[in-house]
Amino acid sequence: MIINQSEFSVSAVKASQYPEGGLDEIALAGRSNVGKSSFINTLLQRKNLARTSSSPGKTQTLNFYRVDSDQADFYLVDVPGYGYAKVSKKQREEFGEMIQDYLETRAYLKGLILMIDGRHEPTVDDIAMYDYAQYLNLPILLVATKMDKIKKNAFNKTEAAFRKHLNLNKDNVTFLPFSSVTKLNVDQVKDWIQARLYEE
């Protein structure tokens, strides 16, 4: 897949604000500060398309990015990060409802890229999101982020830790180590997305 053009489209907190037009969508989920913005910028080859921040909890809406590629046009949808303790309980509940409504009702959603910090074992929140995506029967790309901070000979240890906590043996799950710094597996992510688009 070759990305020809990409742009921020719209922020939404409810279904009436979602973009129209019938394009397929791929959602991005992960803990706050897991590296979703860097992932988007790296994948779409745009330096500051998604704003990166050292402060977790910045994304508080569903952010839709329209992507035009040589294969198909689609939306990449950045979902608010979970597991951020400094937002109020009420805000966490609102985020949860917004994410749930989108993941459970959006007909154009074709898959979920779940991002987990590869330097650590999956958290309780990571496992809950993974199990929820399995419950919804969504195709899942499990991305271990920040792998440039891990020695290459420890990659197998990272994958083993993920396999210990998550059932990665399902047909609808793909695991990839990833780095926005070294561009590790960027093409493989694009291949996974391409395979999801407009499949029946």
Swiss-Prot record:
Pfam families: MMR_HSR1. Keywords: Cell cycle, Cell division, GTP-binding, Magnesium, Metal-binding, Nucleotide-binding, Septation. GO terms for biological process: division septum assembly. PROSITE patterns: G_ENGB. GO terms for molecular function: GTP binding; metal ion binding. InterPro entries: G_ENGB_dom, GTP-bd, GTP-bd_ribosome_bio_YsxC, P-loop_NTPase, Small_GTP-bd. GTP binds at residues 30-37, 57-61, 78-81, 145-148, 178-180. Residues 22-199 form the EngB-type G domain. One of its GO terms (cellular component) is cytosol. Its cofactor is Mg(2+). Transmembrane segments: none annotated. Mg(2+) binds at S37, T59. Belongs to the TRAFAC class TrmE-Era-EngA-EngB-Septin-like GTPase superfamily. EngB GTPase family. Necessary for normal cell division and for the maintenance of normal septation. NCBIfam families: GTPase_YsxC, small_GTP. This is Probable GTP-binding protein EngB. It comes from Lactobacillus delbrueckii subsp. bulgaricus (strain ATCC 11842 / DSM 20081 / BCRC 10696 / JCM 1002 / NBRC 13953 / NCIMB 11778 / NCTC 12712 / WDCM 00102 / Lb 14).
